[in-house]
Amino acid sequence: MDKQRIQARFGHAAHEYDDYAHIQKTAAQHLAERIHARWPELQRVLELGCGTGNLTHHLLRAYPGAQLHATDLAPDMLQACQATCSADQLARTQFSTLDAETANAHGYDLVASSLAFQWLDKPLAVCSRLHSQGARLAIATLIDGTFAEWKAAHQALGLSDGVLPFLGEGCLQRWAHKHGAVLHIETLTETYPQAIDFVRAIKHIGAHTPREGHRPAPLAKVLRQFPHGITVSYRVAYLLVESV
């Protein structure tokens, strides 16, 4: 992954991210509900890839006595998250710029992350390392099957779609079985009146870094595959695992 490009694009999108990140908000809410149902009491939480704070705010409300360490690769995202916190929330939240692949779980009750791990080079290796450090994990990540409609349109035209490779469901299931984790997978969808609206929305949230070596396809050709708009699928995996 080109971390500098990812950081720059998400940072540039921070000011308008929440206007377009509808799926991200839903996934964060669903993850937060699962976290609180499983672990009603937490004291110290590390959040990786907090973005503008969709999961952050759920955690702060659910655990009013907890200390939260919110981290993100993009400083502008951290600033956007800070700007929406109350004085009480700021008093018990630490904000740090951090690459999730270098995170340390020691001293935390829980490491949580919502829709950030798909940007890591080796997400399951990071999960294994953090879990071995003694923390519980609660991760929501996009998996294979995401953007299936967009990818199929490219395939039908013999074009490369440029979508980053997502984790396969089988890989996640094997990891979950090995570590005694609970795995839940759901499909969320979003409908756009025109296919170009989907392309623009992805850019507006900063999630348009392509797969390495990708050469952009003729966009007009792809858009003509969707004369009546497009409904896009997001396959979201929720992984919850107890501490060792």
In which residue ranges do the predicted regions lie?
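N-terminal, positively charged/glycine-rich alpha-helical extensions of SAM-dependent methyltransferases
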Residues: M1-H15
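A short acidic, Gly/Pro-enriched loop at the edge of an enzyme's catalytic core
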Residues: A103-V111
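Conserved catalytic/acceptor-binding region of the Class I
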Residues: R136-Q194, H208-P216
